[in-house]
C-alpha cells in the first residue's frame, strides 16, 4: 500500500468482509487482518510499497515458487505444525521458525545478490 494511515482509516471495509484488523501484530510497518477467529481461515498482510518487510515477504514467496521442492517441504512443515499446535499460534510459529529464517535468508540472497 502507499499509505498505512489511509489503510487504517478504511479497515472497516475489511471488517465488513469478516476480517479482524489486528494492526502491526508484531511487525512494524505492517497491517494484519485475520478471519476465522481462533481457527483462522484467512489472513491478509499489507506493507508499505517497497519496504524491507514487503520485499522480505515477496522474496520468500517467489523463492517458494521457484523452488517447488522447498515449497513442498514447507507445506509438510505447516501441516505438521497445524496438527500439533492445538490452535496456539505461538506454538505453530515456533515450529516453523528455523525453516523460515533459513529459507528467507536464501530467498533474499537469491533475489537480491
List each model region and its residues.
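Catalytic core of pol beta-like nucleotidyltransferases
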Residues: 4-11, 15-113
